[in-house]
């Protein structure tokens, strides 16, 4: 979902191992590791931040993550990058600030391991930065250089020019390089280079092509999605669209891929490679007491110094009133990795001192177990008895189940079930155009899914008007209203598909 659409919605396993699309470094971060920290505010030109990011990406791909970026300093309380770095301190070896304010010295330090550089023009409107990042993704030991000064520095260090992408389009770079690019990951970013510094590191790490998805798509983005669809397994799109969310997610869904909103995410090449946290977050799920609302499923509280710690006594567990309606409050946008890495931890949201006063369901990307396990672990450690985590939307990632080709639905079910098990979640939030039973049944068939909340795209997520249904003995509940949104005037059409049995 779009980061700007933060909404509070009101509502009246074991799976076979699935080859997930997320890569890992040959060596994960552990106590023997060393992370060089670089402050991006100390870098004068944003193009040089892209250079550092591409360096960080192939270092993580080659051996182990060795670079982590913060805004100013590692002790900055407002900088979320620095906050997550502090969570790693001690558990993942040495935090080295030698190059904190000297990215040139950082390049000199790693120059002997570089094979070349790719020149780009950050001011190009035709995708020069995306083209250069794609070239670095496809190659080995390459960094992208966007300024004459950085190019000159690299030349002086004995790093040769490998390719000039200053006038190259992102589409041309993709076509020329796709033989050595991933066929399961793609990164979508504006061709004007405005977000190139964010996902460049993870793109290079994952060998992902980088290209724009404009409003309604174009031939270049169609070609990238078609390549994902040609893979044997489901794919994933990182970054975000540049125009129309519905068209973007629909195109990905039809192409057998899901989206992770991550256009402003940074340091994923490091955060996704943690030995102590990765794939170790699943917690035994306990059945709530009889009659307890699904949204109030409890989690064992752990002692922690983070927001929410110690409040399980202050906020008593809510008990339902007999013969009354049950209302569940669910916070949207937890699929947005940028938000989870950023302001979500702060006092306006999960870090609120009032959190825990009432039961709240927090949508949360179950893929966090693979991509940002430290964020998920931090959230769980700080959870009160009134906090529940709900996978989605729409499971493995953001997609429309009714748009997924029939021959891909089992793959989405398997990936969703596996990620829900890894993240310890058993409630699923789905967004779709229409609640078609045949599209939801595969997801509900997963042993990992206990119940499903369905939000319609449009109509304030509430096109089902609070209706409920039972599929395979599992609850499907539709949203009643969205905080701050007008009430829907009509239900979403069923598009001629088999209707849910509405109770």
Model feature map: region roles:
Residues 1-364, 368-371, 475-503:
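Terminal accessory/targeting
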Residues 221-224, 236-252, 407-484:
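Catalytic domains of cell-wall/extracellular-matrix polysaccharide-remodeling enzymes
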Residues 311-429, 435-454:
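Catalytic alpha-helical scaffold of carbohydrate-active enzymes acting on polysaccharides/glycoconjugates
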